[in-house]
Amino acid sequence: MRIEGILTVAPGLHGAARSDASGNVVEAAGQLDAESLCAVAAMCKVPLEAASELLGLGGLRDFSFSYGQGAFYVHHDGGFVCVVGGPSKSPETIMKKIAHAAGDL
């Protein structure tokens, strides 16, 4: 599956990008600032991993941020798959669909 396919896993998704572990964009589709979003994902990784370790949650795989105007989803698999979309009442479900589809990239 190409990165464009990620946008079809749930309604309201409008941009997706794939990057390496440093946040350097490899592929992007849709309406988003891929460079900035992938850089944010890379910068969030270390503090979120530390929080996960302190809480005994295991390794970081996925994370998402929901805000009034939309949501930011990140699947971590050595690199990142970053997706932006509109607000959702079920961000966990969308994150699971993105992670599943990202495994096919």
Give the label of every model feature segment.
Residues 1-105:
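Non-catalytic interaction/Regulatory regions outside core domains
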